[in-house]
């Protein structure tokens, strides 16, 4: 059967039949049906094949139907080919044994030779990490034999193996069409998807609920570096009952690894058509957020900031006097307050913003010129270098300088006075970031600096890319070419590591208190923002390509599917749609709103990339929907507040199963409040929403 440039055929082997997809005269890939099918009837589940008798193979109207049978099962496969070479398969298993089968696990396995597996992609879990010299997986969750996750744990239900060295079909992806395994009556059970080692092969595995972490079957990754027993994937199959599963196999050629993301994202849009329509208007959202900032603001003779927060007694809408501390997110909040007030032609928010920035810059100086303390302990009313102790993290410092640049640019744009103390402090910090000796030997920023300006933790670290944003904006503020020169040079170094080699992550540490080190999605967010800021300052199209490359990776963190939640969960009782929200990180399998929707939408407008525009709309609409209107959503009757994280998988912060698949965090930080506020304000002021 021909379809476009691709050709679908089959051929008999000794005891099976092979489905072959041809690309012109070249074989793109083939699937041995009997070797593909898997069945297990014991615990822990096995990856066993079974012998089958071939009953019939038919090819009618472009659809191949295969019927197989043995003493236990009859299986029918219906196979078709799309114009782009995508193989669509529906598999139906029927229990023909005459008795109930216990502890059943059904599925399929698509093998690739281990030497051909240059890179592996599992959305939000593993990115382009293949095999080590020992033959084990490099990725921390696959090491030991593999990783198989519930469909709902993956923002897009696919796994992918890349081999850029091989011509014609050098990337192969297995997509699952999400579905429940309906024979589990006591609880909802979905299919599962992952990558495992099978002898000399790396196999993409799709099974009816079994899970694996680090090669350990019947375990899920249930918390921060915690593998939790989970045996709910099994079911009993009465005689004559059927189980049906649909999936797709997609193969394409890519000249380089970065093209793998581009192709797999396009295919994901084709298969799942993600959307999240507007349910809260942008005007209402901005109104709710402005109320929240007004409620959070507090000042005294020697203090100013957006540090009030809801107490535990939500029902009386009481705000505590102070939260735990003043963080750099106060400067982001100050920009939001000022920008929104300028749009509304009101003075109050501008005055609050000015006082907040004045408080910070007048009281947070370090001995080392250019550096600043980043955290004010509200309990002791004293500054600390950071929440991590006597260090100044490069990620937070870069964000602080970048946020300061934003508010300086805003005031200049609207002809508002920028105090000399602001300009002096800002330029001192930017001058510090231009010092080569304050970088690592690779030419990027260290994980942190000591209070005297010394370089700490020289290991390669992604979070410092925020400093690039700060310098790019500094060029826009001052016109000083040194700032943009240093920024672009450092950005290229980050690009080589993060995008081309995918190697720049914080050193893996097995420890409980790992939350502050979860920088993978956020590192891409900050890289994309930095590349966008450099592009805006220079209009260099090479930098725009870096923006788009990061955007493609980031899109794989976004939920494309509105998976079912636990029946009695808090979120399931609401009209909750998880599409458009993105996973926090590889270690934190929860959803949040941290996503560069404005930069993605603008890049899509400039390049004409419809997928970028679509994804930006989906993500910003999802974030807007989370804001409380003051009517009690998410237990928050204060307008504009929102939950920080949402637990939509078998994972939670503390590995407590009662929050799994439908819970959410009760805390609501200033960071989450201001992130979505900033995105909508930027989109609104640019007239692209």
Locations of regions flagged by a protein language model:
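Intrinsically disordered, low-structural-confidence terminal and linker regions
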Residues: 1-5
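Terminal domain-start segments
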Residues: 6-9, 19
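Assembly/interface hotspot detector across virion components, adhesins/toxins, and nucleic-acid enzymes
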Residues: 10, 57, 79, 374-383
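Beta-strand/loop-rich accessory regions of lumenal/periplasmic or secreted enzymes
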Residues: 13-15, 21-239
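Glycan-recognition and catalytic cores of secretory/periplasmic carbohydrate-active enzymes
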Residues: 145, 181, 212, 232, ...
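Short, charged beta-turn/beta-strand-edge "cap" motif at the junction between a beta-strand
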Residues: 249-253
């Amino acid at each position: 059967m021909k379809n476009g440039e691709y050709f679908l055929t089959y051929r008999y082997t000794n005891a099976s039949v092979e489905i072959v997809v041809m690309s012109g005269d070249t074989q793109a890939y083939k699937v041995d049906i009997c070797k593909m099918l898997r069945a297990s009837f014991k615990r822990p589940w096995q990856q066993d094949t079974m012998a089958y008798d071939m009953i019939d193979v038919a090819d009618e109207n472009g659809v191949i139907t295969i019927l197989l049978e043995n003493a236990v099962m009859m299986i029918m496969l219906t196979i078709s080919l799309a114009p782009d070479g995508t193989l669509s398969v529906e598999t139906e298993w029927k229990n023909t044994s005459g008795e109930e089968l216990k502890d059943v696990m059904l599925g399929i396995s698509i093998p690739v030779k281990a030497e051909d597996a240059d890179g592996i992609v599992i959305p939000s879990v593993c990115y382009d990490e293949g095999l080590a010299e020992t033959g084990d997986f490099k990725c921390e969750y696959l090491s030991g034999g593999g990783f198989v996750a519930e469909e709902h744990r993956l923002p897009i239900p696919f796994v992918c193996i890349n081999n850029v060295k091989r011509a014609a079909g050098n990337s192969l992806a297995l997509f699952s069409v999400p579905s429940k395994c309906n024979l589990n009556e006591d609880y909802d059970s979905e299919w599962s998807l992952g990558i495992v080692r099978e002898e000399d092969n790396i196999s993409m595995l799709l099974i009816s609920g079994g899970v694996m972490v680090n090669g350990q079957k019947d375990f899920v990754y249930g918390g921060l570096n915690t593998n939790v027993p989970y045996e709910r994937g099994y079911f009993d199959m009465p005689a004559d009952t059927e189980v049906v599963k649909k999936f797709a196999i997609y193969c394409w050629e890519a000249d380089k690894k970065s093209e793998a993301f581009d192709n797999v994202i396009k295919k994901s849009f084709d298969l799942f058509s993600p959307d999240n329509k507007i349910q809260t208007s942008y005007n209402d959202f901005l109104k709710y957020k402005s109320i929240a900032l007004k409620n959070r603001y507090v000042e005294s003779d020697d203090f100013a900031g957006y540090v009030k927060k809801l107490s535990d007694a939500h029902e009386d809408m009481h705000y505590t006097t102070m939260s735990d501390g003043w963080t750099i997110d106060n400067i982001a909040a100050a920009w939001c307050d000022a920008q929104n007030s300028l749009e509304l032609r009101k003075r109050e928010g501008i005055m609050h913003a000015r006082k907040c920035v004045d408080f910070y810059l007048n009281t947070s100086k370090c001995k080392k010129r250019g550096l600043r303390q980043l955290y004010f302990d509200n309990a002791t009313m004293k500054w600390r270098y950071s929440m991590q102790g006597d260090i100044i993290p490069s990620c937070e410092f870069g964000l602080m300088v970048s946020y300061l640049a934003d508010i300086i640019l805003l005031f200049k744009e609207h002809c508002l006075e920028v105090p000399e103390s602001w300009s002096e402090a800002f330029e001192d910090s930017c001058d510090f970031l231009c010092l080569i000796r304050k970088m690592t030997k690779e030419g990027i920023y260290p994980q942190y600096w000591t209070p005297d300006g010394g370089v700490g933790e020289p290991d390669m670290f992604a979070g410092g890319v925020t400093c690039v944003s700060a310098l790019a904006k500094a060029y826009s503020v001052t016109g000083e070419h040194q700032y943009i020169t240093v920024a672009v040079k450092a950005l290229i170094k980050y690009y080589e590591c993060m995008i081309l080699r995918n190697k720049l992550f914080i050193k893996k540490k097995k420890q409980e208190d790992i939350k502050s080190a979860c920088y993978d999605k956020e590192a891409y967010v900050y890289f994309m923002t930095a590349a966008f800021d450099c592009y805006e300052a220079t209009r260099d199209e090479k930098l725009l390509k870096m923006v788009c490359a990061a955007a493609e990776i980031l899109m794989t963190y976004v939920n494309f599917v509105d998976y079912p939640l636990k029946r009695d969960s808090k979120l399931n009782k609401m009209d909750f749609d998880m599409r458009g929200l993105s996973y926090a990180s590889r270690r934190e399998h929860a959803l949040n709103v941290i996503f560069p929707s404005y930069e993605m939408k603008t890049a899509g407008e400039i390049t004409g990339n419809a997928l970028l525009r679509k994804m930006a709309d989906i993500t910003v609409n999802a974030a807007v929907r989370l804001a409380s209107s003051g009517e009690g959503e998410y237990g928050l009757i204060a307008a504009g507040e929102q939950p920080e994280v949402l637990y939509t998988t078998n994972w939670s912060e503390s590995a407590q199963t009662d929050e799994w698949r439908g819970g959410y965090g009760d805390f609501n930080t200033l960071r989450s409040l201001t992130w979505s506020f900033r995105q909508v304000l930027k989109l609104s002021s640019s007239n692209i929403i």
